[in-house]
Structure formats: structure tokens, C-alpha cells
Amino acid sequence: MKRQTIAFLIQPFKNRLLPPSVLRDSIDRLFKELIDLMNEFPHLRLSCGLPAYILEHANALNLSKVRDLFKRDAIELILTGYTEPFLSLSPTVLTRENIQHGLKVFNELTGVIPTGYLPPFSNWEPSIIEMLREIGLTYAVVSQELFPSNIKNSGGYWTAEHAGKSISIFPSISIHQTSAPADMIDWIEKINKSGSAAENDRLLTIHYLFSLDPLREAGPYRWLRFMASELDKHLLNYQPVRLCDAINSSQSRGFQYIPSSMVTEAHGQADRHFLNYLYSCDQAGILQRKLVDVHDQLTLQTNQKTVPALRKQLFFIQDINRLFPGRESGFTLVSDRMWSFGKMIDIESSLDAHQAPEGGKIQVTDYFRDGGKTVILSNKHLKVYIDHKKGGQIFSFDHRDRSLNLASAYTPDLHDPPDIVSSGRSRTWFLDRILPSNASGNEYAQGTIPSLSNFYQSPFDYKVSAASGGVKVIMIRNCSYIIEDRNIPLRVEKVFGLEKNSSIFSFVYQLTNPSLVPVNLKFTTELNFSFPSCGSTDLRVFHGSTVHENPGWQFFQLKDVTRWAIDDRCGGIRIHFQTQKPVDVWFLPPAPVTRHSSPNQGLTMIIATEINLSPSANWKNIGKLTCRKLKKPGNHHDVC
């Protein structure tokens, strides 16, 4: 009986942000264990999937020994890219550059150019076939879950085709360190019984994933050694091969069309509607649109000296581990989300350094790429993104001096239907509401006070203005609110502005009563802050000599104030607030949502004012917030 052919693919992954020193130690151990394993079991053949930046942090002596393994055809390296790009969410040009740069690094450091591609999370796009073939890659490896149920266990490899272009594609059985079988041979035999491969053509591709994080995973190499020992004992029955050798020694089993899909867990099912889920998550669409926008700006850059370094940073930002939610990584984690925004803010600041107008800059653009317009105000220190279609709310507020998007608070409440900014669900800035005049902050925090208006669901008319003193946008809406089933007309005008070359953001509200009857109401506007220190004692609220530590866990309020401040010692920033007229300021605990919510995902602050308007009268309040830098602890996050 012919021996069964087994292609064993290992993929050490880095899904969490790690300090460079920790990553280097983990990489050194990876290559040392791999070299020792291959020397101890000379009949073993392995394929190893890696992002190219891992090689840049490897010890030179270890790389030299790995090159010796290449020479004796014991191991092959398979490419994920320079990083692990999210194919479905990234600009195609950026993904191509990522993969090409990865090939270049592999060639420079190992002397070998990979011929295989390993899409992270089996994130597959049919349109990538043409690109992979053009840059010299001849095969790809994806989870067998992407294949039709009647053939996914058939073994071998197939030919995937799209628009006349084709590539060899291996269906793999994915196992994680935590789910690796205790009896390797018995596990393989059970797979064989469930499969449909012909007796003389039995290629099984096993994809073993383990983490490079020494704090999260324990003992992945022990199981690797166990696997190698078991295969070595049964060499008469099982023949280990590299994937590149399997293509040369066997024929494709036929053609298969693999649609756009993704597998998010080792034993999960292929999800062909994963982008609908992704755009249902708060902040996901904003991150993606900012990535696309920054890439477009970089593409137009004429200063070629700065482009390669900035593009390399974008490779890390488009990494799927930052852009897809997971238990240990992804934009749902405060650290990952703020890291991604921070890196993109740094790139934008570098690009704007030589072209920012003296008084500031105004852009009116289709930022969401949905046919609408977004107003963007910016200067050297701040950049503000305003969605006039949904109540004139601010969905991003970049403090460039500290590389912080202060409006990137997150809620686990999903957007339904999927949308980039969801009215009433997204945790943005300046969400305006009208409440009954006797409403208290504590009652509102408990959810017992309904809103009488829908300002954040409707568009405002707008006009922009630039002068030597700064830039501003004026938004106006004739609307109404409801009291006892009666529509009460109201005119709302709000102005946002940036002062020239300063970290001062100003806001003005004017409410006009066009009716012939007096009105009495409580007007509120909500701001959701994202600080690195949210949920910890490093975040404090100041009012005069009073200090409130660790806000966000329970309700508290400041009454009749015109000045207060928020300190974030971890982020190194203090925000001073000032209003012309006294206001009440409410700080709310996490909203009760269907899933777990935590104070570290954002701080909700509401500015509330009771207003009495006579017929044809108006009310106006002017405010500003000033961002100032504090001493900041050192940043040791990640390799980018």
C-alpha cells in the first residue's frame, strides 16, 4: 500500500501588541526550536507560514541555520505578506505592496523567494488570484471550511479560478495548540475514514497554529516534537512533504471557485457575510475608512524619501489582527484601537507638515464613500470629522500632538442595519437631545427618561468658513420635539471651529423658538471620550479644588459650572472645558447593553442646561475645550 502523504504547515502568529524585546526573544526561541526539531528528525518535512517582519527581528545566526535547512529541502517558508493584511478590508494596491515587500524581505534575509501564500484567517478574495500570480506566487493554503461540504475532506489540492486566472489551492485542517490531538495517528486515521480521497492519492494538509506570545501560550513546541516523533515512528505509513513538493509530485483534483469568505476560529464555519457583521461593530468602519483615506493621501505624496517608511507603517495598520475583533486582539480592545488610530494620525501629521495652511484647513469630502459629505476641520494640532447628515455629530477627534483619537469610544451594541456611524448607537461627540425640563442626570443614567427629539437622526444644513483666525462649520436645522403628542417647532444652530495654530476647539449652540407659545425644556449634548486611562485611577475629573478619580464606574455630576477639566495621565493629556453660561455636567456609567460593557471602553459626559424660551426668543451658549499635553509615560508597544 502506498504511503499517505502529509503536508504539515505550522504558523506561529503574533495577534497581540508586544514590546520589541519580548517579540525578539520569542522569535529566537521559535527558530532555535525549529532548527533543533529538524536536526533531530531528519526525515521530517515542514512548511512554515510567517509574515516577513518576523525575519527582520530574528537572530542572524539562527537565520544562517535556517538557510541550511532550505538547502537540504527540509523546510519551506510560506508568505502571509510583510505583515498579515486583511484582504477584504484593505486597498488592493496596499495589499499588493505589502505582499511584494514581504517577498523582498524573504529574499534578502533567507536567499529564498516563497512560492506559497497563506491568507490570514483564511480570508479569501477571488480577485486576489491574478495579483498573486503576477508577483510570482503559485499556490495558496486556506481552511477546508471554505470548500463545498461534499469535497472539503477529499484531500489533495485544487485549482481555484476567477476571471480566467487560476492558482493551486490547498484545503487544510486547522488545529490550535489548545485543540491539538493527544493521539496524532488515531486522529489522522479518523480523518481518513471521513474523507473521500482515492487510495493512491491521499494528501492531507494539517495547519497547526500557535502564539508567539510567551504569556498567553505554554508549550507549543512540546506538541510539535510529539508530532514529529509520531510521524517518525510511522514512516512506513506516512510520508511528510512540503507543500511545494506536493504540487510537483501530484495532480490537481479539479477546479473549484472559492467565494469571498473568512474563518474566524480554528473550528469555525466559513462566513461569506463577515463584512456585514464587521460593519455592525462600532468603530470598525471608521478605522477602515481612515486606512483608505491615509493610503490615498500617501499615494499622492511626491516626496519619495518619506513614502517607504510611512507605507511600511500602513502595512502594520492593515494587519488583520488589528482590524478584526477577537478575544485577545482587534479594534474592540482599547489598546489595539487607539494604537491603530494613533499610527494613522502620525502618518497624516507627517504628510500635512509641509502643506497645512497657516490658519487651518477645511475639507468637504465623501469620506464614507456612500455619496454623502463629511466636513473635516484641521490645523497643526487637531483634526475634527463631522457628519452633518446624522445630527452634526463628531465621529473622530484627533489630538495630533498626542496621536489620540479622543472620539473613538466603543460600544458592544451592534449597528442594525450595518452602518459606519449608527444614529443613537455609535458613541460619538455632540449627540443632542431634548429632555423634560425636570429630568435629572441620575434618572437619565438609569434609562427612565425618554428623549423628546431625534436630532441625531436627521441632517443639518451646513456652510463652512475660513479666515485668518481659524476655520469653522455652521450647521442649521429647523426641527421639532414632542411634548404630550404635540410637535413643538425649534430652530437649532450649532457651530464648530478650530482656532488658528492652537489646540482649542470651540462650539456654539443657539436655540430659537419660532412659535407663539413659551417653551421649557432641558437641552443636552453628549460626548463620549476614549482615553487610554479609561476605567483606571489614571483618569481624573477636576472642578476647582474637587477631584473625582476613576470616573465612569458610577454616576456623578457637576452642577452650575463654567469650568472643569479631565486628566489622562497614561495618555499624557488634559482637556480644559469652559462655557459662557453655567451648565450641569453628568458623567455616566456604562449603558446597559445586550452584551458586557466596561468603563475602559469610553467615558460618557453630558452637558445639560435648562432653557426657558419666550415666543420668538433665542438662547445661546458658547463653549470651548483646550487640549494640553501632560508628562507621558514611555511607550513600548509593538515593533512598528
Predicted feature descriptions by range:
Residues 363-370, 453-456, 463-493, 502-506, ...:
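Beta-strand-rich recognition/accessory modules
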Residues 314, 381, 386, 508-511, ...:
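Buried hydrophobic-core signal for structured, non-transmembrane domains
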Residues 2-29, 39-41, 156-158, 163-167, ...:
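Active-site and substrate-binding clefts of carbohydrate-active enzymes
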Residues 1-115, 122-169, 185-202, 221-236, ...:
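Catalytic alpha-helical scaffold of carbohydrate-active enzymes acting on polysaccharides/glycoconjugates
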Residues 391, 396-402, 411, 486-490, ...:
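Acidic (Asp/Glu-rich), glycine- and aromatic
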Residues 11-13, 51-53, 82-85, 111, ...:
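An acidic- and aromatic-residue-enriched active-site/binding cleft used to recognize and process polar
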Residues 25, 93, 97, 380-467, ...:
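Acidic-aromatic substrate-binding/catalytic surfaces of carbohydrate-active enzymes
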